Amino acid sequence: MTNNKVALVTGGAQGIGFKIAERLVEDGFKVAVVDFNEEGAKAAALKLSSDGTKAIAIKADVSNRDDVFNAVRQTAAQFGDFHVMVNNAGLGPTTPIDTITEEQFKTVYGVNVAGVLWGIQAAHEQFKKFNHGGKIINATSQAGVEGNPGLSLYCSTKFAVRGLTQVAAQDLASEGITVNAFAPGIVQTPMMESIAVATAEEAGKPEAWGWEQFTSQIALGRVSQPEDVSNVVSFLAGKDSDYITGQTIIVDGGMRFR
């Protein structure tokens, strides 16, 4: 299946990002897998498209504005158009409030917030160039809907992403551009595993205890899989979501009711 549309996914080498890229290829998109881990991005793109016709890999540090603009421009040049930007890349360190350093602050905000802002700007540039609307999809989190203990930096960045999403949706609506966000809950990914382990270590407890601090709140009784999230991104990237903008879809199995 092909829909002749082009998408870019940041943080696409593994976890949720890879599953999003995989689903978009299944939906007929040509996809750029963008990641700081160049080898990981190449492996992901090769898995998605052995001949490079449906997926390409691009190395980028999303906290660097030039990197993001260059990645989007390269994607548009390679595939001849640009339609969907998925700002998925993120960092999720455990940061008790008194332990946060200036370096940590700059690093996490650089990736989680600046990376989204640069992605919005870079996508907008291409939508204007090709003289059509488009879709921008940002990764926030259930931790961007309600603060989680011990995650000061992560939570505050994800709240910021929701704000950026709402403002950009209003600023760009007249150009036929929708801007929405998805808010995963506890997803079985390497990043979530590191958070669960760190939470347990902080408390001097086993890893299983760390997971329990998060999973006990899930109404549907199971940890989310990356596919649960990629299904929602597929909807936001497709025509069925054309009349939705400025919204955050919570994909957490019933952790937060807002």
Curated annotation (Swiss-Prot):
Which Gene Ontology molecular-function terms are recorded? Answer: diacetyl reductase ((S)-acetoin forming) (NAD+) activity
Q: What is its EC number?
A: 1.1.1.304
Record's InterPro entries?
Answer: 23BDH, NAD(P)-bd_dom_sf, Sc_DH/Rdtase_CS, SDR_fam
**UniProt superkingdom:** Bacteria
Q: A GO BP term, please?
A: acetoin catabolic process
Would the keyword Chloroplast turn up in this protein's UniProt record? no
Asked whether the UniProt record includes Cell inner membrane among its keywords, one would answer no
Residues binding NAD(+) are: 8-32
Question: Where are its TM segments located?
Answer: none
Query: Which SMART domains does this chain map to?
Result: PKS_KR (SM00822)
Q: What class of enzyme is it?
A: oxidoreductase
The record's section on SUPFAM superfamilies has: NAD(P)-binding Rossmann-fold domains
The record's active-site residues are 154, 158
Enumerate the UniProt keywords alphabetically: NAD, Oxidoreductase
Per its UniProt record, what Pfam families does this chain match?
adh_short (PF00106)
> Which reaction is catalysed here?
(S)-acetoin + NAD(+) = diacetyl + NADH + H(+)
Q: Provide the residue positions that the database annotates as binding substrate.
A: 141
Q: Which PANTHER family match?
A: OXIDOREDUCTASE, SHORT-CHAIN DEHYDROGENASE/REDUCTASE FAMILY (AFU_ORTHOLOGUE AFUA_5G02870), SHORT-CHAIN DEHYDROGENASE_REDUCTASE FAMILY PROTEIN
Family designation = Belongs to the short-chain dehydrogenases/reductases (SDR) family.
> So what does this one do?
Catalyzes the irreversible reduction of 2,3-butanediol to (S)-acetoin in the presence of NADH.
Question: Protein name, please?
Answer: Diacetyl reductase [(S)-acetoin forming]
Originating species = Staphylococcus aureus (strain Mu50 / ATCC 700699)
